[in-house]
Amino acid sequence: MAKLIAFDQDAREGILRGVDALANAVKVTLGPRGRNVVLDKAFGGPLVTNDGVTIARDIDLEDPFENLGAQLVKSVAVKTNDIAGDGTTTATLLAQALIAEGLRNVAAGANPMELNKGIAAAAEKTLEELKARATEVSDTKEIANVATVSSRDEVVGEIVAAAMEKVGKDGVVTVEESQSIETALEVTEGISFDKGYLSPYFINDNDTQQAVLDNPAVLLVRNKISSLPDFLPLLEKVVESNRPLLIIAEDVEGEPLQTLVVNSIRKTIKVVAVKSPYFGDRRKAFMDDLAIVTKATVVDPEVGINLNEAGEEVFGTARRITVSKDETVIVDGAGSAEEVEARRAQIRREIANTDSTWDREKAEERLAKLSGGIAVIRVGAATETEVNDRKLRVEDAINAARAAAQEGVIAGGGSALVQIAETLKAYAEEFEGDQKVGVRALATALGKPAYWIASNAGLDGSVVVARTAALPNGEGFNAATLEYGNLINDGVIDPVKVTHSAVVNATSVARMVLTTEASVVEKPAEEAADAHAGHHHH
């Protein structure tokens, strides 16, 4: 395949055009008065959303050099989303501003390597300042504020806070579609663990990149499943009964895994295979916990149950099971409440009788999993399009609330970043030459989120940024009420973790772009050009 190569200024300008195309589509959604973007979906109706990462994921540009830029900034949004689950629009904007500011200086003759040193130092300083400004979040009201700011919906904010209160900040909160138009919270018995699907071919819900199984058969196997003849009879029984299947085993490898993947692709059976978590005795104990929760029998030759002889009586079940890349959540297992309670009592006795701190910690973890329960937020709305939009908002709100509980919050609306930018301007004086320019470049970029929040609200962004810069920590511009005030008291707050990962990911990509001297892309195929030749509009 022939390649096209661009050098120097051309390479960087192409990348910048792509960065701008993507970032400009995303930044209109920023702030309480941000607008929506409509995405054309191959299946189903168009999606109307203001979720930055969803928009970014959908964008691919025709010009290959520009597309490089778009994909680089997309990676900022996706990474920030993976770590913090929110703040993707802020991250995208910071990257765009920093790249534009940096490239302007490179074009004017600045040394990219020195600029980068300045940007890196400024980023470190920014993270220190964020930590210094953080206030801890303790009560439900504050968590509700964080969730409300993230979803722009007070009802959602309160439901998310109630969910977090019920299951704790490390508890599991899942989002499902409701059958009615109401959005409601229910806390169900459930258990989750940190292992995901063995193969991405098991995914059956492409929007969430998860495998979702309703009322599946649950097969728990103590050892590896590696022999197809042993495993086939049981698999055939499941296919006949037309139920989805969840397999949890030490491992599924070779032919059995291939068979499951092929049948999953052909849609013969809805199936997911997951490795059992932990090792040794802990794995054994946790499998027994799962057996009680789902009312299954563990297939284990040690107790005389072999895979090739097992029938449907070994299956357990649950109302719903979702499996993502790195987590499995079992909601409403079929096990009786009495048996689960008896199991808890047994673990409590183990905790009381053990001398080893490690064993005690691990047993407490199991107890927490068995007692934790799972909060299910059922999202309702009048139309399919609205349900999808609201589900994205609820997921963002859960992530924001969890991030806030972990690392605290700062004043929102981009105001904390504007005030940190003032600190950076003073800090720049400690540097010489192009490093100083680098520190200042980040200071300029940090003002952009506040600028666009104000612009989207129909005001002059630069005036708002200048006024905010002069205010004390915690105060700033509230774009919802269009007034200046104490944002923390007004509940306009952002989780530190979200802003932190936005700054880290944006500066990392910007530094890569600034040091780019050439870009290499595949030459577009000729046929494509001819196909359009007959369609000139005069």
From Swiss-Prot:
Residue positions binding ATP: 29-32, 86-90, 413, 478-480, 494
SUPFAM superfamilies: GroEL apical domain-like, GroEL equatorial domain-like
Keyword Lyase applies: no
Record InterPro entries: Chaperonin_Cpn60_CS, Cpn60/GroEL, Cpn60/GroEL/TCP-1, GroEL-like_apical_dom_sf, GROEL-like_equatorial_sf, TCP-1-like_intermed_sf
UniProt-annotated location(s): Cytoplasm
PROSITE patterns: CHAPERONINS_CPN60 (PS00296)
Pfam families: Cpn60_TCP1
Alphabetized UniProt keyword annotations: ATP-binding, Chaperone, Cytoplasm, Isomerase, Nucleotide-binding
Catalytic activity annotation: ATP + H2O + a folded polypeptide = ADP + phosphate + an unfolded polypeptide
Chief place where the protein resides: cytoplasm
CDD domains recorded: GroEL
Single GO molecular function: ATP-dependent protein folding chaperone
EC nos: 5.6.1.7
Highest taxon above the source species: Bacteria
One of the GO biological process terms: protein refolding
GO cellular component terms listed in the entry, alphabetical order: cytoplasm
NCBIfam families found in the cross-reference section: GroEL, PRK00013.1, PRK12849.1, PRK12850.1, PRK12851.1
Similarity comment: Belongs to the chaperonin (HSP60) family.
Its job: Together with its co-chaperonin GroES, plays an essential role in assisting protein folding. The GroEL-GroES system forms a nano-cage that allows encapsulation of the non-native substrate proteins and provides a physical environment optimized to promote and accelerate protein folding.
Subunit structure: Forms a cylinder of 14 subunits composed of two heptameric rings stacked back-to-back. Interacts with the co-chaperonin GroES.
Protein's name according to its UniProt entry: Chaperonin GroEL 1
